[in-house]
Design a protein with these regions (language model features):
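Cell wall/extracellular polymer interaction/catalysis modules
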Residues: 1-154
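Low-complexity intrinsically disordered segments
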Residues: 155-159
Length: 159
């Protein structure tokens, strides 16, 4: 199963995106067919450094990255699995192979403060927030479990 997160609003305090599920992948041309909107997302702000330190230097240095406020994870394609989160005491999707990050989860929450560096799902009906987050998290987990049950890998592409 392919998930696509398209960032549509990059603000100082948050990033809003649209999460879509790909119904069909054209293997010959490696293109997506039948992209279906699923829900909205909320993340920390996208990283845009305006200092003498380059973005590449920060991404190479875990110490520098930890000293910054939480920021949105880099664009890319990441494997998604569901695992137990001791912090949230729940089974939640987690992204694997994110450069410089570990424990990036998709979880419930409403505001940028709730993201804790992760991705929140819901409906963006208020500025800078997502609503009905638990409902959309449940729906997403169901889709992931169904895909895994069919023997499919689950991938999230962030762009």
């Amino acid at each position: 199963m392919e998930l696509i997160l398209t960032r549509i609003a990059k603000r100082k305090a948050y990033t809003i995106g649209r999460l879509s599920i790909i119904k069909e992948v054209n293997e010959e041309y490696k293109t997506y067919e039948q992209e279906e909107y699923f829900c909205d997302t909320l993340e920390p702000p996208a990283l845009e450094l305006k200092t003498t330190v380059s973005k590449e230097a920060v991404l190479r240095s875990p110490a520098k990255a930890r000293s910054l406020k939480p920021f949105a994870i880099p664009e890319g394609r990441y494997a998604v699995v569901i695992s137990w989160s001791p912090r949230f005491r729940a089974w939640l999707p987690i992204l694997l192979g994110v450069p410089m990050f570990s424990g990036i989860r998709i979880h419930a929450g409403n505001t940028a403060k709730d993201t804790q560096g992760c991705i929140l799902v819901g409906r963006n009906q208020l500025v800078g927030q997502v609503l009905e987050s638990r409902k959309w998290l449940y729906e997403l987990k169901q889709k992931i479990v169904e895909a895994k049950g069919r023997g499919e890998s689950v991938w999230l592409t962030i762009k």
